[in-house]
Amino acid sequence: MNYEGARSERENHAADDSEGGALDMCCSERLPGLPQPIVMEALDEAEGLQDSQREMPPPPPPSPPSDPAQKPPPRGAGSHSLTVRSSLCLFAASQFLLACGVLWFSGYGHIWSQNATNLVSSLLTLLKQLEPTAWLDSGTWGVPSLLLVFLSVGLVLVTTLVWHLLRTPPEPPTPLPPEDRRQSVSRQPSFTYSEWMEEKIEDDFLDLDPVPETPVFDCVMDIKPEADPTSLTVKSMGLQERRGSNVSLTLDMCTPGCNEEGFGYLMSPREESAREYLLSASRVLQAEELHEKALDPFLLQAEFFEIPMNFVDPKEYDIPGLVRKNRYKTILPNPHSRVCLTSPDPDDPLSSYINANYIRGYGGEEKVYIATQGPIVSTVADFWRMVWQEHTPIIVMITNIEEMNEKCTEYWPEEQVAYDGVEITVQKVIHTEDYRLRLISLKSGTEERGLKHYWFTSWPDQKTPDRAPPLLHLVREVEEAAQQEGPHCAPIIVHCSAGIGRTGCFIATSICCQQLRQEGVVDILKTTCQLRQDRGGMIQTCEQYQFVHHVMSLYEKQLSHQSPE
């Protein structure tokens, strides 16, 4: 019975811990009031995960399963089981038995009750004798003296026992099994702020793009309307934890199978709220509001953490061998907007897969950009297949080949190379202060096309730039190159390492620059939500979000100076 009670109590503790962990994550999604700004330690678009895993000690091997027939020891085993009350009762009983024994052996056994008064009087008289030598001289070491000695010794022993029990620390709670623990990891970052000016900046604005952590999954259910309510299909939907103390809701904007006729999709209130936020969030900024907001890191931080990340649950892609085509296992293309390669084998879904999404442009124009991950060795051929298939005229690369570890494979040739029948030739390389421009020709059969490859090299390792003009200059160069392609330019491919952080900054800046020129206002919040609908995690960190605001603030000042007075 005691074992069953202890086990029930441990299960209750485990349930409380699980609910507490979920509550911590839920509560950490939104930051209504923040006492201090934040600097998030981040690695570019999730590339630091491998380094952090390398530095962390390996987890201890799992303990062998215990014999189910062997019951665990009861709670409190091996520790003191005596309480204060039991000690006092023991003391009283021992003194009573001691008194009875002494009286019995001293001849008072038959009439001890009759001589109780005399015994007490003898004890009081004995206590009044202050001269201990008088006891020895007078020979009064009789029954009362022995009784007093035994009482004193017993009192000292029992008092010592009680004092020891009172000082004994309470028994620690029984540790829960590892599988019953739910921990809400909270990492509170710090923040360093500096103004983004064309002049030299004194303090760097640190930005390490966040490591992509494995999502923690809630459960939502897909259920047929006419089916038995007891037969439910449980489907995992992801919650991606942002680096820092904030958990961003991950919602799948197009779950495969949800739109099939005869099936209903039951969304959780949190997911429904996140979907509604991405579709409706907006904050139009006039020029003065833009400048003020760019200088308010607290407001930008709070606004950024309100935006759902919209990452994809890896379980959405049940394609064997898919891991070989993803640079990061948790950064996947959203299904509804992903690029599908033409494949000679329609029964092989892996041959048509590439980690890339179509991204809408200014005014919701479809397929203006393609956001993709930095190619890896096993996807270089797929990357060039996509370039040829989409008639891409421009590629923008915003990462170095290595930043602590490999961020992108050098997928272009020194002179010439061929992939799947497409001949790639580098015609010319132009070096500028902030980027390198390669003029490339693509040829397949008798068809030949031109391609411009911009490699932006001014983005510092492991942080955001401390100056906005280089990125603005690149955006303007790419816009002019796209205008030369005509009114119906094919999608512009933009990539970094994971294809969400720096890539999101570039595309958001390009869209907002067009909006600022056309409307005189800018809505960076709405633009960010639009990007995350198409590809989860775009503009990955708070620092990148602030950087986009500073770039747009600088661009608005440039436009106001260029406008006729």
UniProtKB/Swiss-Prot annotation:
This is Tyrosine-protein phosphatase non-receptor type 5. The active site is at C496. Residues 1-80, 169-189 are annotated as: Disordered. GO terms for cellular component: cell junction; cytosol; endoplasmic reticulum membrane; membrane; nucleoplasm; plasma membrane. The chain crosses the membrane at residues 88-108, 146-166. Keywords: Endoplasmic reticulum, Hydrolase, Membrane, Phosphoprotein, Protein phosphatase, Transmembrane, Transmembrane helix. Belongs to the protein-tyrosine phosphatase family. Non-receptor class subfamily. Substrate binds at D461, C496, S497, A498, G499, I500, G501, R502, Q540. Residues 56-75 have a biased composition (Pro residues). Its main location: endoplasmic reticulum. It holds the Pfam family Y_phosphatase. GO terms for molecular function: phosphotyrosine residue binding; protein kinase binding; protein tyrosine phosphatase activity. It is found in: Endoplasmic reticulum membrane. The modification Phosphoserine is found at S245, S268. The modification Phosphothreonine is found at T255. Phosphorylation at Ser-245 by PKA deactivates PTPN5. Phosphorylation at Thr-255 and Ser-268 by MAPKs stabilizes the phosphatase, dephosphorylation of these sites results in ubiquitin-mediated degradation of the active phosphatase. It catalyses: O-phospho-L-tyrosyl-[protein] + H2O = L-tyrosyl-[protein] + phosphate. Residues 1-16 have a biased composition (Basic and acidic residues). InterPro entries: Prot-tyrosine_phosphatase-like, PTP_cat, Tyr_Pase_AS, Tyr_Pase_cat, Tyr_Pase_dom, Tyr_Pase_KIM-con, Tyr_Pase_rcpt_R/non-rcpt_5. Residues 300-555 form the Tyrosine-protein phosphatase domain. Its EC number is 3.1.3.48.
